[in-house]
From Swiss-Prot:
InterPro entries: RsmH, SAM-dep_MeTrfase_MraW_recog, SAM-dependent_MTases_sf. Keywords: Cytoplasm, Methyltransferase, rRNA processing, S-adenosyl-L-methionine, Transferase. This is Ribosomal RNA small subunit methyltransferase H. It comes from the Bacteria. One of its GO terms (molecular function) is rRNA (cytosine-N4-)-methyltransferase activity. Pfam families: Methyltransf_5. Its EC number is 2.1.1.199. The keyword Transferase applies. It is found in: Cytoplasm. S-adenosyl-L-methionine binds at G35, G36, H37, D55, F79, D101, Q108. GO terms for biological process: rRNA base methylation.
Length: 316
């Protein structure tokens, strides 16, 4: 029996409004997920509008296959390939809006078999696309102490990174222990390794699980490439709407928009003519409004939306 997992799209209306959808426009949803944003975009498009959605999760692709609409195309792959896909479909410079809903979807978190959650025991996997790459369990068996520490500290911002890494290495080096292949095993190990003074409201494994997921899926590299790709394929006045779910993601998006909205930096003291400065280029995008956060009502309905932030930019 197949269990059905519900996904509630976060900041749905705000992110779609941010795209300023034109009925005959061309749009890309870089993260189809379970289709909440894509279906809403389609509902606002006219007969000549087009939507291209991307996802690397086979379950998302299966969900997208249920949409029987000639205006809709689903692409199986990472959103970092957006510029390549746009080139293949002849969309470069013609896209009126790109939506990116970063992070893990609720169905991925709630499905124990995907291995994302420390709340439900399942295979220690965490891959967005289970058909490629290696699971977290294999990486933890092979990585050295310094690498594990770095990943937890860099991507989980966990001050107990070294302590957790030592516990993982000690566990795997004890021949009497069973191989660590379950999320429950890792969650318990991290909880046991946490200092008795641990007072955070979050589960002790929260940050480490986030770190391993980000690392195994190269999430930050994917985001960086996707943001650059989106900027390169948008038409003038095309919109970029990005929802992030933790500080690492939001900082990347904020810095990207800030960088794209500035003109070229000319080192102080270097003599240049106006013509030479113009030749360096100008600002590529402009931010639209301030960062959006979910309302109390949305948070009450969907607690997972609490940390989400929406940023919108427009191509110049």
């Amino acid at each position: 029996m197949t269990e059905t997992f519900q996904h509630i799209s976060v900041l749905l209306n705000e992110s779609i409004d941010g795209l300023a959808i034109k009925p005959d426009g061309i749009y890309i949803d870089g993260t189809f997920g379970r289709g909440g944003h894509s279906r809403t975009i389609l509902s606002k498009l006219g007969e000549n509008g087009r939507l291209y959605s991307i996802d690397r999760d086979p379950q998302a692709i299966a969900e997208a296959a249920k949409i029987d609409d000639p205006r809709f195309t689903i692409i199986h792959g990472p959103f970092s390939g957006m510029a390549k896909y746009a080139e293949e479909y002849g969309l470069v410079g013609k896209v009126d809006g790109v939506l990116l809903d970063l992070g893990v979807s609720s169905p991925q978190l709630d499905d124990a078999e995907r291995g994302f959650s420390f709340m439900k025991d399942g295979p220690l996997d965490m891959r967005m696309d289970p058909t490629s790459g290696i699971p977290v369990s294999q990486w933890l068996m092979e990585a050295d102490l310094d690498d594990i520490t770095w990943v937890i500290r860099e991507f989980g911002e966990d001050k107990h990174a070294r302590r957790i890494a030592k516990a993982i290495v000690a566990y795997r080096e004890d021949e009497e222990n069973e191989p660590m292949v379950r999320t429950g095993q890792l969650a318990k190990l991290i909880s046991d390794a946490a200092p008795k003074s641990f007072k955070e409201k979050k589960h002790p494994a929260t940050r480490a699980f986030q770190a391993f997921r980000i690392y195994i899926n190269s999430e930050l590299e994917e985001i960086d490439t996707a943001l650059k790709g989106a900027a390169s394929i948008l038409a003038p006045e095309g919109r970029l709407s990005v929802i992030s779910f933790h500080s690492l993601e939001d900082r990347m998006v904020k810095r990207f928009i800030r960088k794209e909205s500035k003109g070229p930096e000319v080192p102080h003291g270097i003599p240049m003519t106006e013509e030479q400065i113009r030749a360096l280029g100008s600002a590529n995008m402009k931010p639209i409004g301030k960062a959006n956060k979910p309302t109390k009502q949305e948070i009450d309905m969907n607690p997972r939306s609490r940390s989400s932030v929406l940023r919108i930019a427009e191509k110049l």
